[in-house]
């Protein structure tokens, strides 16, 4: 092999190795930032289709209803804990239902209340008295009575509909246009 061909082969080889290293680093970074969505029953029993359960220390999103009477606030600081249950209809909470305790330190959203649907982002941990729990870094409450995130609507067995205008609203929009 002549020197020019060797040099070209070395350049192409180093470029391919560089692309491989960069691709590996990008995939590693993306895998660290993925938050999979689970309901309380999927955390305790696994997903229906695959049986997939989250592992301890994994970052996840959990959605469900705040169980009435489960909210406990620490009077000394902003720590709060509450239990989440599935959004099954009719809404009846039994002790036998799969529930997950969420621990959060911070200011809760204004719309947060018992019996309300929420989504929490955090890490799956295990606390001896409560079992599987979430150390939440963020808690989101739903906006109004009719709004439900697509993930929660799917978990509750409801269809997620986008907001639409009624015929009356469309008619008034046409007549009020300039």
Swiss-Prot record:
Give the record's keywords alphabetically: Cell inner membrane, Cell membrane, Cytochrome c-type biogenesis, Heme, Iron, Membrane, Metal-binding, Signal-anchor, Transmembrane, Transmembrane helix
What transmembrane ranges does the database entry give? Answer: 9-29
- Stated name of the protein: Cytochrome c-type biogenesis protein CcmE
What membrane topology term does the record carry? Answer: Single-pass type II membrane protein
The source organism is: Colwellia psychrerythraea (strain 34H / ATCC BAA-681) (Vibrio psychroerythus)
- Quick one: signal sequence residues? none
Q: Could you cite one Gene Ontology molecular function of this protein?
A: metal ion binding
Q: Which ranges does the record list as Cytoplasmic topological domains?
A: 1-8
Q: Name one GO biological process term.
A: cytochrome complex assembly
Record has Nucleus as a keyword:
no
GO cellular component term, pick one: plasma membrane
**Which residues take part in binding heme?**
143, 147
């Amino acid at each position: 092999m002549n020197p020019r061909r060797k040099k070209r082969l070395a350049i192409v080889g180093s470029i391919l190795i560089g692309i491989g290293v960069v691709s590996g680093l990008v995939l590693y970074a993306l895998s660290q930032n993925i938050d999979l969505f689970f309901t309380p029953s999927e955390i305790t029993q696994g997903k229906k289709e695959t049986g997939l359960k989250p592992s301890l220390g994994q970052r996840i999103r959990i959605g469900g209803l705040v169980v009435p009477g489960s909210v406990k606030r620490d009077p000394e600081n902003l720590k709060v804990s509450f239990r989440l249950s599935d959004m099954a209809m009719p809404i009846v909470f039994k002790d036998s239902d799969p529930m997950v305790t969420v621990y959060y330190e911070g200011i809760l959203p204004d719309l947060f209340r018992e019996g309300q649907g929420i989504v929490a982002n955090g890490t799956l941990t295990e606390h001896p008295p409560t079992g599987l729990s979430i150390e939440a870094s963020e808690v989101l409450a739903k906006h109004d009575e009719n709004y439900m995130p697509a993930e929660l609507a799917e978990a509750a067995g409801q269809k997620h509909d986008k907001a639409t205008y009624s015929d009356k609203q469309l008619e008034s929009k046409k007549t009020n246009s300039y």
